[in-house]
Swiss-Prot record:
Mg(2+) binds at E252. Its EC number is 6.1.1.20. Tetramer of two alpha and two beta subunits. Its cofactor is Mg(2+). Belongs to the class-II aminoacyl-tRNA synthetase family. Phe-tRNA synthetase alpha subunit type 1 subfamily. This is Phenylalanine--tRNA ligase alpha subunit. It comes from Shewanella oneidensis (strain ATCC 700550 / JCM 31522 / CIP 106686 / LMG 19005 / NCIMB 14063 / MR-1). One of its GO terms (biological process) is phenylalanyl-tRNA aminoacylation. Keywords: Aminoacyl-tRNA synthetase, ATP-binding, Cytoplasm, Ligase, Magnesium, Metal-binding, Nucleotide-binding, Protein biosynthesis. The gene is pheS.
């Protein structure tokens, strides 16, 4: 019995000293395996008297259970320590600032178009789109632009053939709308247009927004009121606005609209007028019953004025140093 007690005490000490799971498994085999020290003690049962066997057998089982319990406790302890060490190594310091994702911004031209659409949308105007490759009827004839008008010259227009071209304005969208829908009409038509020009204030492709309202008893005073409100909303200040008499083939009377700049000079911002009766007739609308007004504005020009940009070409150069200012 003394020998059994020493074996158990020795085993418990060795188990406490084990530093990993493999060492514990080796101890288990050494003491509880088929050739282990506790198993060898069971073989001594044959040399004992019948009276001694029960007590000895119980002592061996107790020793076996003590070693097994100690092994289990030590295994659990090592696994817990291993998990804790892993968690410490992988822990997240919640006091550190988060990793932010840099959010891009809308291009200034896109921002301007959205601003225009929002304002006129609140007035009941719907947004219409049309083809960028246009025929001469929708781009010129229906707009009261005669065959010999300077706008039809090769140096101003990109032609595919004499009857097909890149549109020079989005007015064709207005014509297509009036062909398919009956008055009353309130639309704006934003989009890309093309003209053969390139310098500090012109590019071969630029963006326009044109507007059209057709109904009974429409007058010039309503046009002035709408554009006054739009310009003050767009520039977010109570601007001084003037309407200068002008000429456009598709409107009569026609006007160009200026705003007073911070330098005390007038700046042209858009053109407008009452829809010419010939334009209404070309799409089957009776000019004796209906009247309307139209207006058109260059998006890049408005954007330049709003943000203080001096060179139109900056909008198309994709320079991040420039574009990041508008985030």
């Amino acid at each position: 019995m003394q020998q059994l007690t020493e074996i158990v005490e020795q085993a418990l000490v060795i188990i406490d000293q084990a530093s990993d799971l493999k060492a514990l498994d080796d101890i288990r085999v050494d003491y509880l395996g088929k050739k282990g020290k506790i198993t060898d003690m069971m073989k001594m049962m044959g040399s004992l008297s019948p009276e001694e066997k029960p007590a000895f057998g119980q002592a061996v089982n107790d020793a076996k259970q003590a070693i097994q319990q100690k092994l289990t406790e030590r295994i659990d302890g090592l696994k817990s320590a291993e998990l804790e060490a892993k968690l410490i190594a992988e822990k997240i310091d919640v006091t550190l600032p988060g990793r932010t994702i840099e959010i891009g911004g809308l291009h200034p031209v896109t921002r301007t178009i959205e601003r225009i659409e929002t304002f006129f949308g609140e007035l009941g105007f719907s947004v219409k789109q049309g083809p960028e490759i246009e025929d001469d009827f929708h781009n010129f004839d229906a707009l009261n632009i005669s065959e010999h008008h300077p706008a039809r010259a090769d140096h101003d227009t990109f032609y595919f053939n004499p009857k097909l071209m890149l549109r020079t304005q989005t007015s064709g969208v207005q014509i297509r709308t009036m062909e398919t829908e009956k008055p009353p009409l309130r639309i704006i038509s934003p989009g890309r247009v093309y003209r053969n020009d390139y310098d500090q204030t012109h590019t071969p492709m630029f963006h326009q927004v044109e507007g059209l309202l057709v109904d009974e008893h429409v007058n010039f005073a309503e046009l002035k009121g709408v554009l006054h409100d739009f310009l003050r909303n767009f520039f977010e200040e109570d601007l001084q606005v003037r309407f200068r008499p002008s000429y456009f083939p598709f409107t009569e009377p026609s006007a160009e609209v200026d705003v007073m700049g911070k330098n005390g000079k007038w700046l042209e911002v858009l053109g407008c007028g009452m829809v010419h009766p010939n334009v209404l007739r070309s799409v089957g609308i009776d000019p004796e019953k209906y009247s309307g007004f139209a207006f058109g504005m260059g998006v890049e020009r408005l954007t330049m004025l709003r943000y203080g940009v001096n060179d139109l070409r900056a909008f198309f150069e994709n320079d991040l140093r420039f574009l990041k200012q508008f985030k």
